[in-house]
């Protein structure tokens, strides 16, 4: 099956609350490869690659807020965006 890509930019109270750590666990659940990192503006950026169905489930989970302490304001989704092909899902520091 073909793998789809997406870049997500998540705004709100998403840094310092375990968001990247729990996002990594959600990525494992849906067989997502890619990265998650904090941005200087307080948002989080996620690069994701997976089969379409799993990618959509992952995006839905992110919209709900994977970390209990986070408060999501908005999730900007750029499907089909160029993403580095990876075998794992990693937190970028």
From Swiss-Prot:
Keyword Magnesium: no
GO molecular function annotations of the record: acylphosphatase activity
Superkingdom field: Bacteria
Keyword Hydrolase found: yes
EC number: 3.6.1.7
NCBIfam families linked: PRK14443.1
Similarity section: Belongs to the acylphosphatase family.
Name recorded for this polypeptide: Acylphosphatase
Source organism phylogeny: Bacteria, Bacillati, Bacillota, Bacilli, Bacillales
Gene: acyP
